[in-house]
Amino acid sequence: MEFKNKKLEQFEKDIEKKEIAVIGIGVSNIPLIDYLHEKKAEVSVFDDREEDKISKDILEKLKKYNFKCYFGKRNLDNLHGFYLIFRSPSCLPTRPELQKEADRGAIVTTEIEMLIKMCPAKVIGVTGSDGKTTTTTLTARILEDAGYKVYLGGNIGIPLFTKLNEIKPEDLIVLELSSFQLMNMNISPDIAVITNITPNHLNIHKDYQE
């Protein structure tokens, strides 16, 4: 019997015609933008860069999709009234505009968090101050050699959220996760690997404990 991802099917029903914000036009969010367009969501795109700093190909795609676009330092002034907000890892959840929307009832999440929530396969998450990429890559290769179908993602590999319709329960997902991706995440991978912890990025995190 063909496997059907019930969580994904429900999510796709929930977002149809809903107001969704995508903050940050980065590598992981472009496939997400394509996916949301395909699923007929009402999408607004936000980016701290000025419009002339965005690639012409991306701008043409957004125009073709008829998405609302907000660029520049004050782009988040227009962030209000959304059902769901996808933030890029570089857009910290501590930003007042995001906190205000969350208090209002919006779901503030990331592509990675939604992937883990709806993934039918076991997820192995690798984080730490150093050695993440090496550990993640080696883990994926070892599991592949053992005969598993492995999807490699997170900070490396490909954005996996749009692959959810392909992933089967017997597969394995290996993710490299940064501290920024883990901030405010309310779900854990099935297996968590921490390479080490040192006081990095304290210019961004409020303290070592965070």
Question: What role is predicted for each listed range?
Answer:
Residues 1-110:
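N-terminal leader/targeting and accessory segments in enzymes
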